């Protein structure tokens, strides 16, 4: 409101006036009589008046104008009036003892043209005023002294703090410098260490470089020497090959010349009335053989020693053939001469008979000639004991199948799962058999042995055991034997070296679990009857497909497999059988004999030589069997073995050759060359892939 604003203005004006600036003692009533006594007493000078006269009045006189002198006298007369107590000049800071000192220096700055008049109070008031002024002065002096001391202390503290900060800064700088120096030293040490390491590494690299350079130079020299040696060997090989090639051409020329002599002997056929076609046929075969060797040689480069030996064998046979032909011609000539003599004698007798009609005519009986021999054929049937053994194995296999028929034909899902797990546990380890390492082969053997022993094994992330089903053991034994034979039929047929690791595991399992071995033989005889050896006979009323299956052929959709594939499978199974009979598990009991050892291999070889050979089959199986097992049989039977080899060469080869067509001569020639090489070196080589002692340490 407007009135409220004016009220504040009034109060502000009163506060700014002289009375508004006066100091009032609110406690004057407490003093009571002292105040009244002071007012009633006569004025007298205070003991401090001298100080006032000395310090205050001179300043007033200097500053007051002349016109104000009378006013001062008037004011002194008013000292007795207690009602008029003006403000003491000592209250003014300009006239205080402390401010007097400062006013001298700043006189012009604080000097005022108008000075208030000094009114003297009563002596007691002056005393009080002087005490107050004295106290104030002392207080100010003490305050100034305290302030000075405080300032000095603060300055000392500031100096101390400054010195301490300076010292700390120095220490900090020293520590920082020390840290930098230490870091520099560490860095220098690291650099020196790195430099030393780099120098050491450089020296090491230089040494390695020198060593490698030395090795490289040695290798280069060795390579150069090897190259020169290879060049020399290649030159010698070429020279030998060219010499053998020239020899082959000379052999071919001689064979052709002998063949022409065989053809020239055809003129004796009508004259002597003998059949010489067999000699010509065999001569043509030998010419074709030599021509084939030379043709193969021209494709492959130079002839080998085996090629030369085969050609020389053909030449020798051609010479023997021509010699036999000449002997046959001589015998025929002798026979013709004797017949002519006999005819002449008969004619003479007839002429004599004509002269004597009573004599009876005698008709001559033709002679068979000295070269005629009775036909002695080998047997086609297996021995009774072997056949009985074969039938016993097949019956045991059939009984095993019947034993797990419930598990095999079960419709229960749990039983099917158990059957599948058992089959995987039995067959997968056999599929993993390889020549990687002996330790790996031992792990596979231990897993199969544990499974057959009833212990749980891990298969497909699950624990499997034959104890899960009463028929589990029969099922596992049958499937395991079947898988071993299947590996021979497939894996060994493709990779001949695989026969040995599979055979050694099968032999070890056979030794610990004889029933598995019997089932292996049963499966082997069923798929490859020649492993008995057994040539199934065709029975009346038997379907042709069934007979072909009995012979070992695979028949699918009335289609019989190719002969090459059939021979390949038979070869794989015979190789597996030949490896089994000579190998034993190295970690087994050496005190016991082999469950199916080399004596069975000798029996097989003897029995197959006592049977009529089959075209292409007998030669293939004999070669595979002897290549795998020949070295072991040679060490076991020694002289008897070499007699057997000579028997094959001299007596059995002609029988195989007689039934082998020209398109099936490959297996026969391969067998013949193998045996001739063995006879030439008097040793059967160790088969490729045979497991040595170092394999079992891997």
UniProtKB/Swiss-Prot annotation:
Residue(s) carrying Phosphoserine: 41, 88, 99, 351
Coiled coil (UniProt feature): 185-246, 308-356
InterPro entries: GLE1, GLE1-like_sf
Region named Interaction with NUP155: 1-29
Chain intervals with Low complexity compositional bias: 64-78
PANTHER family given in the database record: GLE-1-RELATED, MRNA EXPORT FACTOR GLE1
Protein's recorded name: mRNA export factor GLE1
Organism per entry: Bos taurus (Bovine)
Classification of source organism: Eukaryota, Metazoa, Chordata, Craniata, Vertebrata
The gene coding this protein: GLE1
């Amino acid at each position: 409101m407007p009135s409220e604003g004016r009220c504040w203005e009034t109060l502000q004006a009163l506060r700014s006036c002289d009375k508004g600036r006066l100091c009032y003692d609110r406690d004057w009533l407490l003093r009571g009589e002292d105040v009244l006594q002071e007012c009633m007493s006569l004025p007298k000078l205070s003991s401090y008046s001298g100080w006032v006269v000395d310090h205050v009045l001179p300043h007033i006189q200097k500053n007051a104008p002349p016109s104000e002198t009378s006013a001062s006298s008037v004011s002194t007369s008013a000292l007795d009036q207690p009602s008029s107590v003006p403000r003491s000049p000592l209250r003014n800071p300009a006239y205080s003892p402390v401010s007097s000192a400062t006013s001298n220096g700043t006189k012009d700055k604080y000097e005022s043209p108008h000075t208030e008049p000094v009114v003297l109070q009563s002596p007691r008031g002056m005393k009080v005023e002087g005490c107050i002024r004295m106290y104030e002065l002392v207080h100010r002096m003490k305050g100034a002294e305290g302030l000075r001391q405080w300032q000095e202390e603060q300055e000392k503290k500031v100096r101390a703090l400054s010195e301490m900060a300076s010292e700390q800064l120095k220490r900090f700088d020293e520590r920082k410098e020390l840290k930098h120096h230490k870091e520099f030293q560490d860095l220098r040490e690291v650099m020196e260490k790195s430099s030393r390491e780099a120098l050491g590494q450089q020296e090491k690299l230089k040494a390695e470089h020198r060593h490698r350079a030395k090795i490289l130079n040695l290798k280069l020299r060795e390579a150069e020497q090897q190259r020169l040696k290879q060049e020399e060997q290649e030159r010698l090989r070429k020279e030998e090959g060219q010499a053998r090639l020239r020899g082959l051409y000379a052999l071919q020329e001689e064979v052709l010349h002998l063949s022409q002599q065989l053809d020239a002997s055809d003129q004796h056929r009508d004259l002597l009335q003998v059949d010489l076609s067999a000699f010509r046929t065999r001569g043509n075969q030998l010419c074709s053989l030599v021509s084939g060797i030379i043709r193969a040689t021209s494709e492959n480069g130079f002839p080998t020693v085996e090629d030369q030996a085969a050609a020389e064998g053909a030449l020798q046979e051609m010479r023997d053939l021509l010699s036999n032909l000449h002997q046959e011609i001589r015998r025929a000539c002798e026979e013709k001469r004797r017949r002519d003599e006999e005819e002449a004698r008969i004619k003479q007798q007839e002429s004599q008979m004509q002269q004597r009609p009573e004599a009876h005519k005698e008709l001559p009986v033709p002679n068979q000639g000295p070269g005629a021999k009775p036909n002695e054929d080998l047997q086609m049937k297996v021995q009774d004991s072997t056949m009985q053994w074969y039938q016993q194995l097949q019956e045991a296999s059939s009984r095993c199948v019947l034993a797990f028929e419930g598990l095999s034909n079960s419709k229960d899902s749990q039983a099917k799962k158990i059957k599948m797990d058992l089959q995987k546990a039995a067959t997968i380890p056999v599929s993993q058999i390889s020549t990687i390492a002996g330790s790996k082969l031992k792990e596979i053997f231990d897993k199969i042995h544990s499974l057959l022993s009833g212990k749980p094994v891990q298969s497909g992330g699950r624990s499997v055991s034959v104890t899960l089903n009463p028929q589990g053991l029969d099922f596992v034994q049958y499937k395991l034997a079947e898988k071993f034979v299947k590996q021979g039929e497939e894996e060994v047929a493709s990779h001949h070296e695989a026969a040995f690791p599979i055979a050694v595991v099968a032999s070890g399992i056979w030794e610990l679990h004889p029933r598995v071995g019997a089932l292996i033989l049963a499966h082997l005889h069923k798929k490859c009857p020649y492993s008995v050896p057994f040539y199934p006979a065709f029975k009346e009323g038997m379907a042709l497909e069934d007979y072909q299956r009995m012979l070992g052929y695979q028949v699918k959709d009335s289609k019989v497999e190719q002969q090459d594939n059939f021979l390949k499978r038979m070869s794989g199974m015979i190789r597996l059988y030949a490896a089994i009979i000579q190998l034993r598990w190295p970690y087994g009991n050496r005190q016991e004999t082999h469950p199916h050892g080399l004596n069975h291999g000798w029996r097989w070889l003897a029995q197959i030589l006592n049977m009529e050979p089959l075209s292409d089959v007998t030669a293939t199986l004999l070669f595979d069997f002897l290549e795998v097992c020949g070295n072991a049989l040679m060490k076991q039977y020694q002289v008897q073995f070499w007699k057997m080899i000579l028997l094959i060469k001299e007596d059995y080869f002609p029988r195989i050759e007689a039934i082998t067509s020209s398109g099936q001569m490959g297996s026969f020639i391969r067998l013949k060359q193998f045996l001739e090489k063995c006879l030439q070196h008097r040793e059967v080589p160790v088969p490729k892939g045979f497991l040595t002692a170092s394999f079992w340490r891997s």
